[in-house]
Structures are given as C-alpha cells and as structure tokens.
C-alpha cells in the first residue's frame, strides 16, 4: 500500500523514520483510474500540509515541504474510502520509493507559512506556496537533497 509520510529535513539523515501519522488513498471500488490518481495526489497534499505542521513545531529544520512516498503493509488503515490518516506507522528507507520535496527555491514561501501570525496570513501563504509543485527525487538522491536543503 502506498503510504505518504510527512517529513523534516533531519529525517533525510536518519536510518529509520520516526513513528508518526501518515496518509493513504483508499479508492472506492467504482473509481476510475483518473479518479484514483486524483485521490493519490490528495493524500500527497495532506502529507505535505502535515510536514508544514511538523516544521512549525521544529523551525530549526530546512524550510521545505517533504513527503516520503512508501510502499508498506499496514494493518492500521481505518475502514472507509478517500484520503485516510493512519497513525503509529513505522517505515525505514527500504520502504521509501520516492521523496517528494521542495528543492530549496521555495524556502521563502515555506517560511511565510511557518511564520504566519493568523489564519488569513497562513491561508494566503499556503496558496502562494501551492503554486510550486513538489519535486520528485529518487530515494538514492536523499543525501544530495539534504545538501540542497542546508
């Protein structure tokens, strides 16, 4: 199952990803391929938003949205369809199939989200940030990405 983990730049240097919430896309049986792709994108967006929350609570990390796309088996998926949150899921780098992240050029936009003083500022900053899609990195590029984000 594809599970999307929000991450911080420090996670890129760790051997194991710490236990945290993650997101999965669970399509309904009647969904077409295109609808499933939209649902997967929505799960990535939820994980990216969650990465901003992690960053807000730990602002010494690089200002970047980071999502780890993993293929893992988990029994903790709640019943239902749509984008679902799963908790207390553990994975390691062998499970990661891709890293979705800002490439460092959006650090100012991410900083504006993190430092927003009210909901209106945050909403505007997030809207501006979402003009920049996450970049796809192969898991073998994790050290290079860590250097980019320093």
Say what each PLM segment does.
Residues 10, 14, 49, 53, ...:
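Charged/polar, solvent-exposed surface patches and flexible loops
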Residues 70-150:
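Glycine-rich, aromatic-bearing surface loops/beta-hairpins
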Residues 1-27:
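Short, extreme N-terminal segment that most often corresponds to the first beta-strand
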Residues 19-76:
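Positively charged, polar, low-complexity stretches
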């Amino acid at each position: 199952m594809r599970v999307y983990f929000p991450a911080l730049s420090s996670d890129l240097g760790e051997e194991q990803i710490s236990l945290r919430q993650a997101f999965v896309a669970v399509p309904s049986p009647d969904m077409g391929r295109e609808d499933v792709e939209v649902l997967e994108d929505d799960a990535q967006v939820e994980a990216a938003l969650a990465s901003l929350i992690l960053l807000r609570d730990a602002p010494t990390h690089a200002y970047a949205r980071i999502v780890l796309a993993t293929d893992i088996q988990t029994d903790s998926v709640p019943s239902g369809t749509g984008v679902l949150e799963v908790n207390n899921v553990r994975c390691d780098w062998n499970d990661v199939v891709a890293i979705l992240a800002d490439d460092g050029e959006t650090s100012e936009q991410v900083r504006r989200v993190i430092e927003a003083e009210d909901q209106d500022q945050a909403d505007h900053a997030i809207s501006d940030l979402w003009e920049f899609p996450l970049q796809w990195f192969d898991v073998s590029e994790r050290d290079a990405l860590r250097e980019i984000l320093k």
